[in-house]
Regions:
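N-terminal secretory signal peptides
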Residues: 1-18, 22-26
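Surface-exposed binding/hinge segments that line
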Residues: 127, 163-210
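Gly/Pro-rich hinge or "lid" segments in bacterial periplasmic/extracellular proteins
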Residues: 102-106, 197-255, 259, 378-379, ...
Length: 545
């Protein structure tokens, strides 16, 4: 196999085709077919509801009313945000990072106008744009990137994303516009998971002066970044709503909108009603229950993109009998995913057999092309339940309002297994606290707005992963995950992820359920929206009013 030349990851643009060439250089012929599928899957997003998009000169001004589907945003410090919906739907509005994604999940410049990667994959050199500023007027220089890095790795700060920076052995600034990161070993997803706008929360630049003057707790609630919109602290409430103001100093030109009013709407049905009534102009994510209904509304446009997420039912290994693999497998095999998708999600998602989302087609294997021990088989599930002694058990599914429908379907299905499943619905902040503390029997969760399969695997299935609150430990999986981070050969990475998938299917840290389709919706007078899967970039949006 030829030696990998990591320098092809240098910017100012890294396309998916470059990733193909990287693999081809190592003789990965079979990868070409998968990349063709990936190119098709990540073509510019389809307009699910076909409307004539009015052409014309963008208009400046106005306020976009943005309905955001969550009960409460716990915090907005990018290095602390642990909810993918917030990372994808809010952070890209307030923060810029070194690089960003295009619609095909290729990498393009953001704060860094270009970057180079050494042939051995160990040295990343970023050249910042000249004249960058934070929202508070402070200049953004290389020293601020260094501050952001040092803050994220500080054990006292306790960023859940510090692991994405663990490979860095030195961070240097030869001058005000140059940042050099040296890694101890190649880290394949470094640009995507550490340096990108939205998912790359670990290195998303924040204002040092604002952080030091405000303190960590206040900065959580009113952050200062360098993105297209600044956070308006006055009157802000992360449980009800807040305002974002167009940033005149944004490097790519002031956004067309004057303001974005973010309204927190917890209940899915309330979100749908708000969009139809015109109370909001846009929903970050259209609930599955409302997609068909909104598609029929001639005043609305829906845009769909391939999802990068997965959802599963996690069973807490620290709470018997769910430490018993037979008990977990019994539950996994008793869930009819096709029925779950049709009944709870109106047929929109695709069944999941693991944590590799369809958007990552270079590694994704459709369920009908492989076998999984978690496949629905009620007879086998009943035999396992009897053997494990769980008939009559009363586990509780902990969820949020968005989880109610799938939780109810799962509860009903598992009555056939002799389980009396309870449902506990919590608002987001309480759910988040108990999730991270491992204080639950079962939980519906998974990864959202992934920049690379590393996000949805390392965080959940590495023994020390930040989201592994159900205490899953498998040394073989740990070793394979470390290996995925160290290789630049996409075919090799895909094979490693397939090995991991086989193991976690059998271990059942999650009963894997489905992959969602990313659907956003807005009124027809919202123009200029550029869709990137599970991320919201709104600086190009304007209102035709």
């Amino acid at each position: 196999m030829a030696r990998i030349n990591w320098s092809v990851l240098s910017g100012p643009r890294v396309s998916r085709r470059t990733l193909l060439n990287l693999a081809a250089a190592s003789g990965a012929a079979a990868y070409a077919g998968r990349m063709a599928i990936a190119d098709a899957a990540l073509a510019p997003p389809s307009i699910a509801t076909r409307r004539a998009i009015r052409q014309g000169e963008p208009k400046t001004g106005g306020t976009l009313n943005y309905g955001f589907g969550i009960s409460q945003i716990p915090n907005l410090d990018p290095a602390k945000v642990n909810l993918g919906v917030v990372a994808g739907g809010i952070l890209p509005l307030i923060f810029s990072s070194l690089v960003q994604f295009d619609a095909q999940l290729g990498l393009i410049p953001d704060l860094a106008e270009e970057w180079t990667v050494s042939e051995d994959g160990l040295v990343y050199t970023f050249t910042l744009r000249d004249g960058l500023t934070f929202h508070n007027g402070d200049p953004l220089k290389a020293e601020d990137i260094i501050f952001t890095y040092e803050r994220a790795i500080d054990p006292d700060f306790a960023s859940p994303h510090a692991n994405k920076l663990a490979a860095i052995t030195s961070a240097e600034m030869p001058d005000d516009l140059t940042v050099v990161f040296t890694l101890e070993a190649p880290f394949a997803p470094f640009l995507a998971v550490a340096c990108s706008r939205g998912p790359g929360r670990a290195l998303t630049p924040v204002s040092p002066r604002a952080f030091e003057e405000m303190g960590a707790e206040q900065f959580d609630l009113a952050p200062v970044g360098a993105g297209p919109f600044s956070f308006v602290a006055e009157g802000a409430d992360l449980s009800s709503g807040f305002q974002l103001a167009a940033f005149d100093g944004y490097y790519n030109g002031r956004p067309f909108l004057d303001q974005i009013d973010v309204t927190i709407i917890a209940e899915p049905s309330s979100r749908i009603s708000a969009l139809e009534a015109g109370d909001v102009d846009m929903l970050d994510i259209v609930p599955a229950i409302g997609v068909a209904q909104l598609q029929e509304n001639p005043d609305l446009t829906l845009v769909q993109s391939p999802g990068t997420s997965w959802l599963g039912l996690a069973m807490n290994w620290a709470r018997p009998p769910w430490d018993n693999p037979e008990a977990r497998m019994a539950v996994a095999k008793a869930i009819n995913r096709e029925d779950l998708i049709q009944t709870a999600m109106f047929g929109l998602p695709t069944p999941s057999i693991g944590a590799i989302a369809p958007a990552f087609a270079w590694a994704y294997i459709p369920p009908d092309q492989t076998e999984t021990p978690q496949a629905f088989n009620l007879d086998e599930a009943k035999a396992l339940a009897e053997s494990a002694g769980i008939v009559g058990a009363q586990p509780t599914i902990m969820g949020t309002p968005d989880d109610q429908r799938p939780a109810e379907v799962i509860r009903n299905q598992l009555t056939d297994l002799g389980l009396d499943v309870q449902i506990e619905q919590l608002q987001q902040a309480a759910w988040n606290e108990r999730w991270l503390a491992g204080d639950y029997d079962w939980i519906l969760n998974g990864s959202v707005a992934d920049a690379d399969p590393d996000d949805g695997h390392w965080n959940f299935f590495f023994s020390e992963g930040p989201w592994n609150s159900y205490k899953y430990v498998n040394s073989e999986v740990d070793a394979l995950l470390l290996e995925t981070r160290a290789t630049g050969d996409q075919e090799k990475r895909a094979d490693l992820y397939h090995q991991i998938q086989t193991i976690i299917q059998q271990d059942v840290p999650h009963a894997f359920l489905y992959h969602t389709v990313d659907t956003t919706g807005f009124s027809n007078d919202v123009q200029g929206y550029n869709a990137v899967p599970e991320m919201r970039f709104l600086e190009t949006v304007w209102l035709d009013r």
